[in-house]
Amino acid sequence: MTLQEAYEQMRRELLSLRRENEKLKNGTYVDAERLAHEKEIRKLKRELARALKDKERYHSLWRECRFWGSDDSRLEILRLSKLLEEANETIKKLKTQMNRNHENSSFPSSQKLFHKKIKNSRVTTNRKPGAQKGHPGHKRPHMEPTVPTIVLPPAQDIISNKDFYPTGKFITKQIADIDIRVSVTEYSAQIYRNRITNERYHAAFPDGLSNEFNYGKNIKALAFLLNNYCNVSIDKTQELIQGITDDKIILSKGLINSLSKQFSDSTVHDRKKIYDMLLLAPSMHADFTPGRVNGKNVQVLICTNPYETLYCFSEHKGHQGIVGTPIEEYLQTLVHDHDITFYNYGGGHQECLAHVLRYLQSAIENEPDLTWHKNMKALMSGLIHECKQERNFSEKRIHEIEEEYDRILSFADSEYCLHPPSKYFPDGFNLFLRMKEYKDSHLLFLKHPDLDYTNNLAERGLRKFKRKFKQAVTFRSNESVALLCDCMSILETRRQQGANLFDTAKLAFIF
C-alpha cells in the first residue's frame, strides 16, 4: 500500500467517525441491530393484523354455516322466509277484506249482518217516555165527522141527582178509519140494427173501456203502488187486495205485472219534462248500481237533484251507460263518487266526501305506521261540520283550507317514501294520489255554497231500486227493469215535489 492510499483510507475512517460522533451528540444514532429488530417487529405486526382479519372472516363463515347449514339449507330457509312474508301479507289482505263494511268502504250498510248498537247522545233520565209535564202537547187534530155525531147519554143516577146540572160543554173523542167497499159501475148501450143494410150500431163506450169487465183506476193505482213502490210481490199484492175486498176482486198476476207498462206509456211526456229540468239544474247527482237479469249483470243510472229524479236502464256501465241520459248533454256541476267516466261530462265535478271519509278510515285501520290519513280525515270532518254551521266561506278561510290540504298531502308523500305501500293494500296510496290529482274536485264545494259535498241524494235514490231488486231477486227481462226505472222516475219526482202518490198513480190509468 502506498503512502497516498494509506492517507485516503485514514481520511474516510476519520469522516465516518465524525459522522457517528455527530449522531451520538444529537441522539439520532441507531445501530444496525436495532433497525433489524424494528423491521422484524413491523413485519410481525402486519402478519398479526392479517391473521386477525382472517380469524374474523373465518369466524363469521363458521357462524353463518352453523346457522344456515349447507348451501341447500340456506336456499331453503330463504325460500321459506319469502313464503312466510307473502303469507303474512295475504293474511293482512284477507283481514282487510273481512273488516270492510259501510263505515270504511263503499259497501252498503244492508250487507252488514250484525250492526253495532246505535249511539244515543241523549242523557239518561228516570222520566217515562211520551209527553212531559210542562211541555206543550201535540194532539192529533180533530177531523170533520162524516157521519152524524153520536151523543152519549148520561147515567140515570146523574140525571136524577139535583146536585148535577149541565154546563153546556162537551168532551169529544173521534175514531178515524177507512171504509173499503167495492164500487161497480155498469155501462149499457142498446143495440140498433139497420133493416136494409143489416148494419149494427150502439152508443160509444168511454175511452179505455174495451173489455166486458174492466178494473178502475183506484184498484189499479193501489196494485201498482204496492208492487212498484212498496216492493210487495205480485202474489202478496193479489192476496192483499183479494182480502180487503172480501174475495170480490181477484186481480190476475198478468194484470198486476202489466200495470208498470201502462204507467210508463202514460207518463212519457212527464219523463221528458224531468229530463229537460235536470239539464237546467245548477248541479246533478249521479251514480250507477248493478242489477241482474236472468243471471246477467245490468246497470241502473240515477240522475237527480232535490226536485227531480230520473232512473235510466243500461246493459253496461261507463260511456255506454251514459248514452241517452241527461249526463250526456249536461254542462253544469256533477256530484259523484269518483267514477272516472263522469269526468268526461259536465262542466265541474264534486267528489262525494262521505266516500272519501270511509276510504280514509280504511287506510287508518290498515296502515298503522302512517298518520297522514288521520290528519286528512280530521280536516274533512271538520269542514263538513263547519259547512253545517255556515256555507259562505271567506277567501282567506278557503286559502287556509287549501294550504292545510296541500301540507297533509306533502306529508303523506314523505311518509310513503319511508314506508312504501304494500302490494296487498295499495288503497291508501291510491287514495293519496287521487286526492292530490283531483284536489279541485274535493274542495269545489267551498266556493259554491249551494253545492252538496256528498252524493247521498243519489245513494238514497238508488237504495230504493236495491230494495225492489232484493225483493224480486232477479228480473226476467231488460224491459221489466226499464219499465221499473220509468215508474220510479215519476214516483220519486212526485214525492220530492210533495205530491200525493196515489193521485199520481190514478192519473196514469184511465180506468
Segments predicted by a language model, with ranges:
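Short, flexible loop/hinge motifs at secondary-structure junctions
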Residues: 2-211, 257, 286
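Catalytic center-proximal scaffold of phosphoryl-transfer enzymes
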Residues: 18, 22-26, 35-38, 42-49, ...
